[in-house]
UniProtKB/Swiss-Prot annotation:
Pfam families: Bac_DNA_binding. Belongs to the bacterial histone-like protein family. The gene is ihfA. This is Integration host factor subunit alpha. PROSITE patterns: HISTONE_LIKE. GO terms for biological process: DNA recombination; positive regulation of metabolic process; regulation of DNA-templated transcription; regulation of translation. GO terms for molecular function: DNA binding; structural constituent of chromatin. This protein is one of the two subunits of integration host factor, a specific DNA-binding protein that functions in genetic recombination as well as in transcriptional and translational control. GO terms for cellular component: cytosol. Heterodimer of an alpha and a beta chain. Keywords: DNA recombination, DNA-binding, Transcription, Transcription regulation, Translation regulation.
Length: 101
């Protein structure tokens, strides 16, 4: 199962008491702020969750898996996410309980 923006809005509606329109707008604005910051080259730091940052990748050689032909992979900018320590700890403890089942 994956978490969608609609799921997040529904949770805000149920648990915070926002109406559905407000909940949807809040979720959209949250992601728009992240997009805008990244578009402006700014890192996004969400306390206890993690950081989104832009990273420039240089051009590098690649290979077409079907033909084996070497082809260049162009330079590009990518978004990276580094989880915070609290998120890592929670995920690791959850993963440990699933392995025991």
């Amino acid at each position: 199962m994956s978490l969608t923006k609609a799921d997040m809005a529904e949770r805000l509606f149920e648990e915070v008491g926002l109406n559905k329109r407000e909940a949807k707008e809040l979720v959209e604005l949250f992601f728009e702020e992240i997009r805008t910051a990244l578009e402006n080259g700014e890192p996004v730091k969400l306390s206890s969750f993690g950081n989104f940052e832009l990273r420039d990748k240089n051009e590098r050689p690649g290979r077409n898996p079907k033909t084996g032909e070497e082809i260049p992979i162009s330079a590009r900018r990518v978004v990276t996410f580094r989880p915070g320590q609290k998120l890592k700890s929670r995920v690791e403890s959850y993963a440990g309980t699933r392995e025991e089942q």
